[in-house]
Amino acid sequence: MYRFTDFDVSNISIYLNHVLFYTTQQAGDLEHMETRNYSAMTEFFLVGLSQYPELQLFLFLLCLIMYMIILLGNSLLIIITILDSRLHTPMYFFLGNLSFLDICYTSSSIPPMLIIFMSERKSISFIGCALQMVVSLGLGSTECVLLAVMAYDHYVAICNPLRYSIIMNGVLYVQMAAWSWIIGCLTSLLQTVLTMMLPFCGNNVIDHITCEILALLKLVCSDITINVLIMTVTNIVSLVILLLLIFISYVFILSSILRINCAEGRKKAFSTCSAHSIVVILFYGSALFMYMKPKSKNTNTSDEIIGLSYGVVSPMLNPIIYSLRNKEVKEAVKKVLSRHLHLLKM
């Protein structure tokens, strides 16, 4: 049997010390490298649609024109709902909230998008990306709740007109609008904080035209189970349950409209609800395509086009739809414009 001498024990001890030192040093270097990668994330590069350089100027002009239409149309709708006393009702109060929401939503995404279209670098700061995400998620969630609230308002107005002023009193409809904003802001804040706290491991190229949460999560190199779970629950509530409530409201509304004997009353009810239903189809159609379809590793051009539609086209069309489909809004617009034109002539 071999017996260890003092010399052997000394050599083994020295060898183990070297191994321990080398392992500790390697772990420290790795930890330092990871910390450096995590802390060095100060900006992101948005490369969505950059594979079509010949379209950058066209997209810039298109989005700029749409943005001006959004600001003009939604601002006009807000102004007439304030100035015209006939529009001081819950329905137009919610419509004013929707117009203000569309202005805020597009103002958070379109100006940075315009800069990126004309920029060679196509970068956005970490803070700017987080702010864009929290605003877009918050206002998107708020719009889901607000559209459901508007559907309930239509339901009460058509199915229970005699008690409408009692049910939709001033306190209730202001609280409903306020809670729409609060719920949207809280859900977006939670999702944004949980996403921006994740390690990106130096990968800062976002394959999208905005800081969209799904595109950003593809850059994460750690477990995103909690993020996916929260996003799934939020999407089910915002996109499925609320859409189902809107659908149920319209089933009752349609059955009540068909029982109206007066042709003029039936036409007015249809015109009021048709504008809201078109807005719901546009908004939820784009949102369901973006957030509920099977996800792929790479972002498709169709995803970016739908994202552009979701963030630009719908807010642009909302005031146009409500103006064309609503007689009271058209009359209020004519009244406000004629008054200002008369003042200009004087």
Curated annotation (Swiss-Prot):
Record flagged with keyword Glycoprotein: yes
GO molecular function, one term: olfactory receptor activity
Pfam family membership, one: 7tm_4
UniProt keywords, alphabetically: Cell membrane, Disulfide bond, G-protein coupled receptor, Glycoprotein, Membrane, Olfaction, Receptor, Sensory transduction, Transducer, Transmembrane, Transmembrane helix
Protein's cellular compartments: Cell membrane
Transmembrane segments: 58-78, 87-107, 132-152, 172-192, 230-249, 270-290, 304-324
Any one of the GO CC terms: plasma membrane
InterPro entries assigned to the protein according to its UniProt record, in alphabetical order: GPCR_Rhodpsn (IPR000276), GPCR_Rhodpsn_7TM (IPR017452), Olfact_rcpt (IPR000725)
Disulfide bridge partners, by residue number: 129-221
Extracellular-side segments: 1-57, 108-131, 193-229, 291-303
Entry-linked PROSITE patterns: G_PROTEIN_RECEP_F1_2
One annotated GO biological process: detection of chemical stimulus involved in sensory perception of smell
Top-rank taxon, per record: Eukaryota
Glycosylation sites: 37, 300
Cytoplasmic topological domain residue ranges: 79-86, 153-171, 250-269, 325-346
Membrane topology per record: Multi-pass membrane protein
Cited PANTHER family: OLFACTORY RECEPTOR
Function: Odorant receptor.
Name listed for the protein in its UniProt record: Olfactory receptor 13D1
Organism of this sequence: Homo sapiens
